Structure formats: structure tokens, C-alpha cells
């Protein structure tokens, strides 16, 4: 779920943050609190404590507190940052297969460009050196930034929101694409050699520029995971991993 970023230098390039304008969400029961609010600092401390990695401190001017005041836990949040002339980041963060991370009724979390933060333990992600920094490249000197929550998915699977930025299709792909690839692997098992199957997976995994289609986007990381399993544990482990993907109950996403 977390968008892992190495941003110490990155944010330094951006200079001082501009004002973050928080647009209240049209989703009933969702409360947003931005850095301009006198309550913001206390809420941040309540959620993650006072020990703040440098990268998080730099991200806080673009961060918003999201409190769930509905009666149902939230399984996915689409937070969108925009500038007057462009979308800076459309972060459709989902916890479909991690029920322990659902945002419970009454709970508040931080929606920041690096990811959704729920507690202090998650801050260790900032110490890791891996990066998905394309998610924040447009935050370099962005001017005035607007943030809102465009859509959520509740624990029941119910999608709620305007869906102006394609979150439903992206979440649908996150659920279905791994299952489709796992099914294809098991179907090929009987009619193709393992070398042919691996070659096919390598072709899927080798894509460097993400395609526009969300289903194709979500196929790439699954192919890489399956390849890693095969390379470390062998053919039977590959098929076992594919089967385990299909054994997981399907999250009931619906409009």
C-alpha cells in the first residue's frame, strides 16, 4: 500500500512548499484537516508521534489528515493533488488484502504524497533506499496545490465518490489482474514447457514504461513476483504461488 520514496534530495530541489488548499470531500462522513488548520499538528502527533524523518517533514506541507466519521471501515482512499494547470498526483491507495490496515470508524490517518500513514511504526519506510519517485516529480516548485479525497471504498466493497480520476478502474485492475495472470500461468502449465512460460512472464515483466491500461499496469508487478518465485524456488513453487493468488477471496468491489 505504501508508496516507497527516497525524497531527501528530491524535496530539497522543490524549495519551500506553497499553501495547500484542502477541498472538503463530497463523501459524507469524511473529514479532511490540512496544514492551515490549528488542529493539524496535534492530529499528526496523535497519529505518528513526534519523531519525524526528514523526508516526512518535507512532505507534511502537502499532507492532509483524513478522519473516517462513517459507520464502516474504509479499505481504499483516492487522494488527489492538483495544481491550477495539472494533476500532481492521483494516489489510489488500497488495502484490499490487508484488513488490519482498514481505516476504522473514528480513526484518522495521514494522506501524504509518500503514502497513507496510520501509526509510528510505518515511519521506518522512509529509511529504505528504494524509490517510486515518479509519484512526486511534479511537486518540484508546484505553486499552489489543492488536495481532496475523490473516492473511497468501504469494507463492504461499496465504492463511493465522484471517480473523476479513474480510481474505480484502477482498483478493479488491482483486484483482477493478478488473478487473471495466475489463471493464465496454470492454464499454460499443461500445454507449454516451463521455459516457454518463463519467457512469456519475462516479456510481461520487462515493460519499463507503464501502459495506459490499468489492467496491463497491474499485470507487470505480478509477473515480476511470479518470476522471482520461480528463480528462487523453482517450477512447482511458481505454480503453487499462482494457485495461492486464486485461493485468496475476491474483494467484492462494486459501485
Residue ranges and their predicted role:
Residues 160-191:
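Short beta-strand elements
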Residues 2-14:
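Sec-dependent N-terminal signal peptides
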Residues 85-139, 155:
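Intrinsically disordered, low-complexity Pro/Gly/Ser/Thr-rich segments with frequent PxxP/GP/PP motifs
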Residues 194-255:
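A eukaryote-biased signal for long
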Residues 17-61, 69:
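Low-complexity, acidic Ser/Thr/Pro/Gly-rich terminal tails and inter-domain linkers that flank the onset
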Residues 51-52, 74, 98-102:
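Beta-strand-rich interaction surfaces with strong enrichment in secreted/lumenal proteins
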Residues 58-60, 64-75, 83:
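Asparagine-centered strand-capping/turn motif at beta-strand->loop junctions
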Residues 86, 151-162:
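Short acidic/polar inter-strand loop motif in beta-rich domains
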Amino acid at each position: 500500500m505504501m508508496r516507497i520514496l527516497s525524497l531527501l534530495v528530491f524535496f530539497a530541489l522543490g524549495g519551500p512548499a506553497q499553501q495547500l488548499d484542502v477541498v472538503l470531500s463530497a463523501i459524507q462522513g469524511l473529514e479532511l484537516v490540512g496544514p492551515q488548520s490549528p488542529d493539524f499538528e496535534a492530529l499528526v502527533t496523535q497519529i505518528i508521534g513526534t519523531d519525524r524523518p526528514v523526508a516526512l517533514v518535507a512532505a507534511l506541507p502537502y499532507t492532509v489528515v483524513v478522519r473516517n466519521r462513517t459507520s464502516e471501515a474504509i479499505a481504499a482512499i483516492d487522494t488527489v493533488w492538483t495544481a491550477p494547470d495539472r494533476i500532481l498526483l492521483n494516489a489510489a491507495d488500497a488495502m484490499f488484502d490487508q484488513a488490519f490496515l482498514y481505516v476504522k470508524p473514528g480513526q484518522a490517518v495521514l494522506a501524504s504524497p509518500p503514502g497513507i500513514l496510520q501509526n509510528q511504526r510505518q515511519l521506518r519506510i522512509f529509511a529504505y533506499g528504494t524509490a517510486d519517485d515518479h509519484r512526486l516529480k511534479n511537486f518540484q516548485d508546484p505553486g499552489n496545490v489543492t488536495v481532496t479525497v475523490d473516492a473511497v471504498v468501504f469494507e463492504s466493497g461499496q465504492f463511493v465518490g465522484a471517480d473523476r480520476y479513474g480510481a474505480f478502474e484502477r482498483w478493479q485492475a488491482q483486484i483482477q489482474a493478478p488473478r487473471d495472470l495466475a489463471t493464465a500461468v496454470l492454464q499454460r502449465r499443461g500445454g507449454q514447457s516451463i521455459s516457454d512460460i518463463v519467457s512469456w512472464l519475462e516479456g510481461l515483466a520487462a515493460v519499463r514504461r507503464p501502459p495506459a491500461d490499468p489492467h496491463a499496469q497491474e499485470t507487470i508487478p505480478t509477473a515480476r513476483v511470479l518470476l522471482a518465485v520461480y528463480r528462487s524456488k523453482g517450477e512447482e513453487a511458481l505454480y503453487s504461488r499462482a494457485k495461492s493468488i486464486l485461493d485468496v477471496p475476491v474483494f467484492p468491489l462494486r459501485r
